[in-house]
Amino acid sequence: YKECFFKNVVVVTGTYCSGKSMVAPIVSSLSNVEHVRKLLVVDQIFHLANLRKINKESAIFLVRHYLDKSFYEQLIGRNINFRVEDETSIFTAKNTEELANRILIKRGEHIITKHIKKKTIFCMDTHDGIMLYDYWTKVSKGYKFINIYRNPIDTVASWEKHGIGKIEKVRFNEVVLFKNKK
């Protein structure tokens, strides 16, 4: 069993092209909220568990561990995104200089303790958070969810525009696909 270190998390969720990328930066702009993270491996782990490719307990453990590690790495400046045009880039954050200076911070458990006391809020963008809500409640009870709903006609039009539906041909596929065994 592994308990999460960081319990103040806002999960901005919705289907592809629902508007998460507009809402998450607004959440991140609030005081004491970290810059938004896209941690898509969490979706993959939960989908694998939901499809019974891995067991639920393993999925919960992996997600707790991955989120704690990702949030800690964010706090010490590891894996910083310097791509100017990306929505998770430090150049789109409210505190660009502070985020860049984190690479100079001495790492260690004191960072975790400091941010637990400070009640730092982490913001992450994910797909299918409400569909897989049962899994999320097992990760931590304190997470807050903002589920984005969009007119389905507009959503499907955006999917068509972005090539979603031809997902099998996309190299960086975020959807879990399995071949049928005959």
Residue ranges and their predicted role:
Residues 20-34:
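A conserved segment at the C-terminal end of the G1
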Residues 38-124:
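PAPS-dependent sulfation machinery
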Residues 17:
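Walker A (P-loop) phosphate-binding loop of P-loop NTPases
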Residues 1-2, 23-24, 111-113, 135-136:
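Short, flexible, glycine/charge-rich loop motifs used to bind or transfer phosphoryl groups or to couple energy/partner
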Residues 31-37, 160-163:
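A generic secondary-structure signal for well-formed alpha-helical elements
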Residues 12:
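Hydrophobic anchor at the beta1->P-loop junction of P-loop NTPases
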Residues 112-182:
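PAPS-dependent sulfotransferase catalytic domain
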Residues 1-9:
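Extreme N-terminal, non-catalytic leader segments
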